[in-house]
Amino acid sequence: GVASISSNFNQGTIDVTGLDLDLAIEGGALPNAGGFFEVTDPATGELFYTRAGSYETNIAGAVVTRDRFRYQLQGQDGALLLGAQEGENLLARRVEEDGKVNLLVNKDGLDTLRTAGQVKLVNFSAPQYLRRVGNGYFSNGLAGQNIAGMLDNPLPTIGSNGKIRQYALELSNVDLTNEFASMITHQRSFQAGSRVVTTSDMILSEAVNLKR
């Protein structure tokens, strides 16, 4: 049987998408591979951690995951709000390597650059203890728990944290070609072992019949 299932947090390939709220974590110290985005379930307040960086804004301007969960991306001061304010026309969003988010807006005919928040990265001293909850999300335990040893460096490029790459996503770190080759090798080994067992059974059966 399978003794255990462990998560591999080594960095995957970075793929440029051109979408301004596609964010990848690049660099950082292994085995943490640069940290995790922190997201929250707005219905329950529960926190989760993920390397997936595909986001968009909802009608309220909050940055949320593009999947069906719609978890809110956390900044240094809570959920990030990157929508235009009253009277503004949003022209562009810029996420710096250190996580600072600047918005280029037009108000009353003037283009203005304003800081809108800071993307939060979270890292752990023992990420192998993060609890997998599915769909690329992980939990650090129940409220008040710290089962994976959260570190006090919540900023990109600080400590073991990586930097933020805007307009890009991190792809899976699984090499499908190697995994399929490994699976076929193991399958053939299993089949060979099964044939050995079958042959041994046949020889034993013949020996028993001869004795009779």
Ranges and model annotations:
Residues 1-77, 81-84, 88-212:
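Amphipathic alpha-helical polymerization modules
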